[in-house]
Amino acid sequence: MKNIYPQKKVGLYTPYLDVLGGGEKHILSIIKVFEDLGLALYIFWDKDLKKEIKERLGLTFKNLFFLPNIFKKKSFLSFLKFLLISKNFDYFFYVTDGSYFFSSAKKNFVFAMAPDRNLYRLNFINRLKLLNWQFISNSSFTHKWLKKWGINSYVISPYIEEKFFKLKKQKKETIILSVGRFFGHLHSKRQDLAIKTFKKIKQKNLSFKDFKLILIGGLKKEDRDYFSYLQKIAAGDPSIIFETNLSQEKIYDFYQKTSFFWHFAGFGIDENKNPQNVEHLGIAPLEAMACGCLTFCYKAGGPKILIEDGKTGFLFSTEDELINKMENIIANKKKQNEIKKNAHHFVLTNFSYEVFKQRVKKLIIKI
């Protein structure tokens, strides 16, 4: 692509870069738009992660460089050093961990990945530091909470990969799918409730006797105890299947053949007290909707904003409400097709890469 902004530079620091999860893909995708416009990218991190970023996140950079991580000590000297270095950047992005600093870059952005009050306690000194910064939020839900805390932000939601919108002409199978990392802390995906609800609906209604529950998610060593607990409550039921650390291509294949998608993240949590512990956006439900799965989400956080109950998917507040809605829709093929069509159109209209790219470009023009 033609270099529209010759010699301009973009900087990034995120203390979470070693995670390389959805949040990291989001912020890296944002700066990738800048690279495509001809800008050079610089990340403050001691290790060159281009290979890992390509393998794990599917993002390839041609003009990305890594600089020594001067932030890791969080000393006065390191922040002073950054103040001198940052004048070389036209744009600088920072994923906050609750700390803030002065920057002499021309334009500065705090990227807000979660509506956690502890990350945005802006005392007088922090407000001084942020006089030349603008906030970007990852979802309408995060934006709403930042606004409640007196912070204005510009929403740039992540995008859904183009392949998810290309529906394969294959018959949907008797599968209920849940996708999300296996862990029992913070905003857990609550696969335990999916298992219990699945057992309950199979016992109650013969229409679901041939269904399988497939639980897909990333699994780390430190989360093995929670995973073992899930296997225990599944109690050897052969219709409950666990799939760990699958490639994106294999996950995509499951979406394509799945009939129903369940998402329990945030279940039982009061989002008005702990908004950080419910689903902030809900990428997996959006992927499911794009792939023609009838999607059911716990009524909190991002999904509550995104899904129009009974039109683009379904929301539930209790396990029994989920079961009732499943029973009501299982035999109504006409309604199923109508909802699938609406959901696919909604995601395509609001979460395609083209929509994402234009949001980022508007940010550049805006500033």
List the model feature ranges, each with a label:
Residues A40-S99:
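Active-site donor-binding segments of glycosyltransferases and PAPS-dependent sulfotransferases
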Residues N132-K166:
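Donor nucleotide-sugar binding/catalytic pocket of nucleotide-sugar-dependent glycosyltransferases
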Residues K168-K189, I195-K200, I214:
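Conserved donor-binding/catalytic core segment of Leloir-type glycosyltransferases
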Residues F227-Y252:
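Nucleotide-activated donor-binding/catalytic signature segment of Leloir-type glycosyltransferases, i.e.
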Residues Q256-H280, C293:
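Acidic donor-binding loop of glycosyltransferase active sites
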Residues P285-C297:
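Short hydrophobic beta-strand element within catalytic cores of glycosyltransferases
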Residues E308-G310, F314-D320, N328-K334:
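Conserved acidic donor-binding segment of nucleotide-sugar-dependent glycosyltransferases
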Residues N328, K335-N350, F356-K362:
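A short, well-ordered alpha-helix in the C-terminal region of glycosyltransferases
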